[in-house]
Amino acid sequence: MISTNDFKTGQTIKFNNNLFQIVSFLHVKPGKGAAFVRCKLKNLRTGSIIDNTFNSGIKVELAFINKNKIQFLYIDGNKYIFINIANYEQIEIEKQKIKNKIKYLYEGIIVDVVIYNDYEILDINLPEKLNLTVTKTEFIEKKDVKTNYYKDATLETGLVIKVPLFIQQGEKIIVNTQTGLYVSRCNK
């Protein structure tokens, strides 16, 4: 159990029979009345974010989650197959659990898996930035440069993003997985 006075960003709590990660919190001490803690909580099972207010000093159950390094192997229907790097155990994750991260997965990528109670897989965490190869890009003529500063590029994972005009097919670029935006050329 943890007091609401001891909340920290990133902690995981059990509340209303669900697992929530504390995204942000604010201790409020009004001039009149009892103090309270206003929180923004992310449901780890659904991904939704809620706002909640706790009375100051009440106890909430702390949930312990594990993170393990896993490597993506292949797709089998609606299941994505990974291997745990530590013990070489094969892990199957349903497509719906990682639906918004599928567009960044390629064979061999290493990600963190978030597990509750050693059996319930909640999510995967991608690296903040990935080096990906451009497999297809539009050709833009020089006369169109005044209007188009970015063009579409298809990456090796199938993801389509906007890139600067100088990026060509076959080049490696860095993509931010949080925003889905082009960062820079890859120097490697």
UniProtKB/Swiss-Prot annotation:
Q: Which UniProt keywords apply?
A: Cytoplasm, Elongation factor, Protein biosynthesis
UniProt keyword NADP, yes or no: no
Name the pathway it acts in.
Answer: Protein biosynthesis; polypeptide chain elongation
GO terms for biological process?
peptide biosynthetic process
Which GO molecular function annotations are given, in alphabetical order? translation elongation factor activity
Q: Which Pfam families match?
A: EFP (PF01132), EFP_N (PF08207), Elong-fact-P_C (PF09285)
Q: Which InterPro entries match?
A: Elong-fact-P_C, NA-bd_OB-fold, Rib_uL2_dom2, Transl_elong_fac_P/YeiP, Transl_elong_KOW-like, Transl_elong_P/YeiP_cen, Transl_elong_P/YeiP_CS, Transl_elongation_fac_P
Places the protein is found: Cytoplasm
Any single GO CC term annotated in Swiss-Prot or TrEMBL for this entry: cytoplasm
* Matching CDD domains: S1_EF-P_repeat_1, S1_EF-P_repeat_2
- Biological role: Involved in peptide bond synthesis. Stimulates efficient translation and peptide-bond synthesis on native or reconstituted 70S ribosomes in vitro. Probably functions indirectly by altering the affinity of the ribosome for aminoacyl-tRNA, thus increasing their reactivity as acceptors for peptidyl transferase.
PANTHER family from the UniProt entry: ELONGATION FACTOR P (PTHR30053), ELONGATION FACTOR P (EF-P) FAMILY PROTEIN (PTHR30053:SF12)
The record's family statement is: Belongs to the elongation factor P family.
Recorded hits in HAMAP family, A to Z, give: EF_P (MF_00141)
Q: What is this protein called?
A: Elongation factor P
Q: Which organism is it from?
A: Phytoplasma mali (strain AT)
The upper taxonomy is: Bacteria, Bacillati, Mycoplasmatota, Mollicutes, Acholeplasmatales
This protein's gene is called efp
